[in-house]
């Protein structure tokens, strides 16, 4: 039997948190501290990295987080400032209140400091409240200027830290400012700094009507793919389901694009197992990602590229199926 040198796997720490929605306002489980979540991530057994929301839960110190990560054998890949909570319900970068914008910038500067302290790869910027809900609500010119200028100021003040923008079409805003791969790349071009890139969420690309593989290629071609998250959904909402449960072929194409471009990075989960066991959901996800990795090893890439050159979809599918389905016969 072949042995495989699998990639490193990671997860957003929220994978192990408690969730609420607009119906179950009392939550789907007990409140869990940052330390509790790190300990749960440890139970998965095959995670190397976690992305940590910041600030940490009340009462948890940076020193305690460092100790917990060390004890769990985990490292921080990113810090995600929570610039989407109640305080910034009208926006972070684009809030009409200058004081609210200043408070958001302060939190993001603090997050850059945490990245340095933990040796993480980047600050993940997900400005979920930046955008609008109604026609005529905003000046699109002014809103875009606030978003782009704000990112430029933030990244320019922290040139030693990478900032990865995670785009998404909508939710919580009806329309988010950073809503697509193309728009995010245009904004990064306007920003004009090397330390600003993209964190590509597979589910956000699906939900936005994109091909995640196509989006990945677009971003890689411009040297801006700083990180990625995988999950799954039914394309009508950001369901954050367990990866591979719906779009198996498209997730394979996504990782194929990463492979042929020699993109080296953590294979990271961004999932919300509301009703499922959090640890088991992560373990099942990693099991599937290992299947994908083995399938990439089996894939006849020259034959596939010849089929693609001829734009022969049936031949391409035959080659893909031979690799993808045969990889699943190996038990985990």
Swiss-Prot record:
Cofactor note: Binds 2 magnesium ions per subunit.
Localization of this protein: Cytoplasm
One example GO MF annotation: metal ion binding
Cofactor(s) required for function per UniProt: Mg(2+)
Keywords (A to Z) from UniProt: Carbohydrate metabolism, Cytoplasm, Isomerase, Magnesium, Metal-binding
InterPro entries reported in the protein's UniProt record: IolE/XylAMocC-like, Xyl_isomerase-like_sf, Xyl_isomerase-like_TIM-brl, Xylose_isomerase
Cell membrane in keyword set: no
E.C. code: 5.3.1.36
PROSITE patterns, sorted: XYLOSE_ISOMERASE
GO cellular component annotations of the record: cytoplasm
Statement: the UniProt record of this protein carries the keyword Isomerase: yes
Residues the record lists as binding Mg(2+) 1: 166, 201, 229, 270
Known pathway: Carbohydrate metabolism
Binding residue positions for Mg(2+) 2: 204, 238, 240
GO BP: any one term: carbohydrate metabolic process
Name of the top EC class for this enzyme: isomerase
Reactions mediated catalytically: aldehydo-D-apiose = apulose
Family: Belongs to the xylose isomerase family.
Role this protein plays: Involved in catabolism of D-apiose. Catalyzes isomerization of D-apiose to apulose.
Name of this protein: D-apiose isomerase
Organism (species): Pectobacterium atrosepticum (strain SCRI 1043 / ATCC BAA-672)
Gene: apsI
């Amino acid at each position: 039997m072949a042995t495989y040198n699998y990639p490193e796997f990671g997860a957003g720490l929220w994978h192990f948190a408690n969730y609420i929605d607009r119906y179950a306002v009392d939550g789907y489980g007990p409140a869990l501290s940052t330390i509790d979540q790190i300990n749960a991530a440890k139970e998965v057994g095959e995670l190397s990295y976690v992305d940590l929301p910041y600030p940490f839960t009340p009462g948890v110190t940076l020193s305690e987080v460092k100790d917990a990560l060390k004890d769990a054998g985990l490292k921080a890949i990113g810090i995600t400032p929570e610039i989407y909570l109640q305080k910034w319900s009208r926006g972070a970068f684009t809030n009409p209140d200058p004081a609210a914008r200043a408070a958001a910038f302060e939190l993001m500067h603090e997050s850059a400091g945490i990245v340095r302290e933990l040796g993480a790869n980047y600050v993940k910027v997900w400005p979920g409240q930046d955008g609008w809900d109604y026609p005529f609500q905003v000046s699109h010119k002014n809103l875009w200027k606030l978003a782009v200028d704000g990112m430029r100021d933030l990244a320019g003040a922290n040139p030693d830290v990478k900032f990865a923008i995670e785009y998404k079409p909508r939710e919580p805003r009806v329309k988010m400012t950073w809503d697509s791969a193309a728009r995010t790349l245009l904004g990064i071009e306007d920003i004009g700094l090397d330390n600003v890139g993209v964190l590509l969420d597979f589910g956000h690309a699906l939900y936005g009507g994109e091909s995640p593989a196509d989006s990945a290629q677009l971003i890689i071609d411009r040297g801006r793919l700083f990180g990625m998250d995988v999950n799954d959904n039914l394309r009508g909402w950001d369901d954050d389901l367990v990866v591979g449960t719906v779009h198996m072929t498209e997730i394979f194409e996504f990782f194929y694009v990463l492979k042929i471009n020699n993109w080296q990075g953590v294979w990271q989960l961004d999932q919300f197992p509301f009703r499922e066991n959090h640890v088991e959901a992560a373990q099942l996800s990693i099991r599937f990602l290992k299947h994908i990795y083995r399938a990439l090893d089996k894939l006849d890439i020259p034959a596939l590229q010849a089929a693609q050159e001829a734009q022969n979809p049936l031949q391409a599918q035959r080659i893909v199926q031979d690799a993808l389905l045969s990889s699943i016969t190996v038990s985990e």
